[in-house]
Every structure is written in structure tokens, then in C-alpha cells.
Amino acid sequence: MSEAVPTSARKSKNAPVAPGPAPVLEIESLDMEARGVGRTMTEDGEPGKVIFVEGALPGERVTYSSYRRKPSYEQATVVDILRPSVMRTQPKCTFFGTCGGCSMQHLDMRAQVAVKQRVLEDNLWHLAKLRAETMFAPIHGPSWGYRYRARLTVRNVAKKGGVLVGFHEKKSSYVADMTSCEVLPPHVSAMLVPLRRLVEGLSIRDRMPQIELAVGSTVTALVLRVLEPINADDEALLRAFADEHKVQFWLQPKGPDTVTPFYPLDVSLDYTLPEFGIRMPFKPTDFTQVNHQINRVLVGRALRLLAPSRDDRVLDLFCGIGNFTLPLARLSREVMGIEGSDTLTTRALANARENGVDGHTTFACRNLFEVTGDDLRALGAFDKFLIDPPREGALAVSKALAEIAQSGAGPLPKRIVYVSCNPSTLARDAGLLVHEAGYRLKGAGVVNMFPNTSHVESIALFERD
């Protein structure tokens, strides 16, 4: 009989493994989260696990340390770079690697765009078995200081000397101890330390979890999420800060509907689309594109691809405050904008009036995630569609178009421009439009809306005979 092994000597599956040499891996590609991807080999020379290595780049030979192990893959961080990639560059930000705001600063900008283009192509092929007839040239813009919208977390952390204001640490709920940010506009980056001092002096320093910022053409708005009312001393501090830093404060005591301007009251946010003579007022909680410079180029490309004429009726789905609707109205007979938010629909109508295009526009509030073929038929015939959905994509719209095509009951637009912030849902919807609704994927390309991050914005053109 074998001798029983004492409980204290038995190996636990969670027991720490004795340290040994870090394994070596050849990195073949990047995934959608900007992690290096490699594959181990078995003793028989067969492909083994897929390893996702944070901080590694394609073409590199690295050692790594795994922090999560699954039967078919592991997640790891890079330990040492034995052979660096020619694409590797020195991150500009001191806090890169700790702060979760960026994930690709170590990758050359041209390579970043190339990686995103490949992510788009791979998604179209693997998820929809599609290849675009043409790959559009990428849309480029500023690499730094471009982020005109951000949500900053506020924490009073005694161990770190007081109040922190910034993005979350990478893969953590902790707030990064950051004193500057290279992707925020310089004047906002320079405000991070003064903001810390401001919050330190408020009576509700422990009851203000978040600051949302929105940068307009002439003013920067800061929305303070306040869980308790501010007192007179707080009000005085906010007014003094606003005067010194030329910002406008808004207060949000509860949900988004409770956001109200505090000080000063005689300024307002807007952005412009000079190519089309459009000025777009907005509130700091309205959805607007993060990168205003790229947005201008994106709107121009979308309209050139859609090619509206004075005879066209155009349907703009997920229209928001009218970012595409109003420029389209300059060039079309009629544009109808549909949005799921009543607040944004109201704002879009007001913007159309302010820009003198309300005679060519109509707006409606509808749940586009539940739209059907009958719903689209009820809107009447449209020559062209522009679709700009959130990350969830436009599945119901795509299914509705497929149903109309297959039933033969109802008109279909001859051209669709689809602007996407998620290549996976774009590929899914493209599969429906091509394989079930009879469209051709004429072209697709990336829009580098979020430099130094792994987010992939793209634009695609569909046509139907």
C-alpha cells in the first residue's frame, strides 16, 4: 500500500509555480486589443496554445509571463524583448503602460493604421466572407491632442496624497496617478493638476466620482457628477477656477437629464464643418465625435461616396444631432434623420433651423434596434442611406433591408454609406446587406479617429443595381 501524502504536501492547482526561465515566443500579429499574438509549439512540433502578450509587437521575439491560463490560450505580459520590431517606437506619454487611456503608443503611427486596416479586412473576411472591391486610403489626422471628449474618474486616495483625476489604470478600477495626458488637448492636459487641487478644496471631494469634459470651438465644458449639493464656498471656488482657466462648469446631481449649466451661463459649445458652412451647437452630454478634425474629413468622404444630388431623398439613420444630416441637406432634395434619443432628435431639429436647412430636413425619434421592413416601407422611398450606428451596429436595419429585398415588396436605396466604430458588427451587417439584400461591397477603409488606441473606426460603401 502506498503511503498517504500529507495534506500540507499535496499540490494545489492554485499554488505558486516555482520560478523558472520565462518562455520565449515569436509574435505573429496584433489582435483587436493591440496585444501581440503568438503560438507555442508542442514537443512534437505541432501548433500549441495561442498566447496574447500585452506590450509585444508583430515580428518581435519576446519572453513573457502568463497571468491567465485557459485550455486553448493564455493571456500574458511581455517580460523582455529579445528582438524588437522596426515598428516599435518610444511612447510619448510618461504614464503609458499604467494608464488605460492608450494602448498603442509603442507602435509607429503608420503601423497603427496598417494594423487597423488589417483588423477591418480580417473581420470582413472571417465573419462575412467578404472582401471589398476597393480598400479606401485611410483617413489620417493629428496623433496627439485630438481627444475633445473624455470621462475622467475622481478619487480621493489618501495613500497617494489626496485627490486623483484621470483615466482608469490599465485593466483596473483604480485611477491612474497622472498629471498630464498627451491625447487630450494641451490646455486640458495642463488642467489636470489644477483640477486635483480644485476638488481637494471642495466640501464634496468624496462625493464627486466623475468629471466629463467636452471641448468646443471656443469653450471647454466640465460636467461635475455631484452626489451631494455644493455649498456657497464650493460655488465660489468653481467660479474662480472657471474664470482662471476659461472653462464652463455644469452640474449633474442624478441622471443625464439632470445636467444643467452652472457658470458661466453666457457661453455655449459648438463645433463646425467649414466645408459645408455648418455650425453645430451641442450640450456636453450629447454624443459628438471625439476627434473634431477627423470628423470633418469623415463627413466630407461620406458625402462624396454617397454622392447626393438635388433630386435625391436621403435617409440618415442614427443621425444624432445632425452631424451628417445637415451637410446632406445642403446637397439633397430632402433628408430624413432618425435617432433613438428624443433629446438628440430635438437638438438636430434646432441645429437644422439655426443653419437654415430645416426646409430640406425632417426628423423622427424611433428605436432603430427594433425596426422592421414594414417600418422602412412606411417611411417611403429613399434613393440613398447613411448609417452611423453605435458599437452594437445596425442589425435590425440590415435585416429589414434584407427582408424587403427578398420579398420584393418595397423600394431599396441604390447606395448605402455605413460609418462604423466596431469592425465586428460592421462585418456582420455587411454580410446581411451583401448575401441577403443583394448589395455589393464597393469599398471600405479605416478612419484613424482614435490614434494610439486600438479602437477601429471605418467607413464602407454598398451599392445595388
UniProtKB/Swiss-Prot annotation:
One of its GO terms (biological process) is rRNA base methylation. The keyword Calcium does not apply. Residues 1-22 are annotated as: Disordered. [4Fe-4S] cluster binds at C93, C99, C102, C181. The keyword Glycoprotein does not apply. Residues 16-80 form the TRAM domain. InterPro entries: 23S_rRNA_MeTrfase_RlmD, NA-bd_OB-fold, SAM-dependent_MTases_sf, TRAM_dom, U5_MeTrfase_fam. Its EC number is 2.1.1.190. S-adenosyl-L-methionine binds at Q289, F318, N323, E339, N367, D388. NCBIfam families: PRK13168.1. Catalyzes the formation of 5-methyl-uridine at position 1939 (m5U1939) in 23S rRNA. This is 23S rRNA (uracil(1939)-C(5))-methyltransferase RlmD.
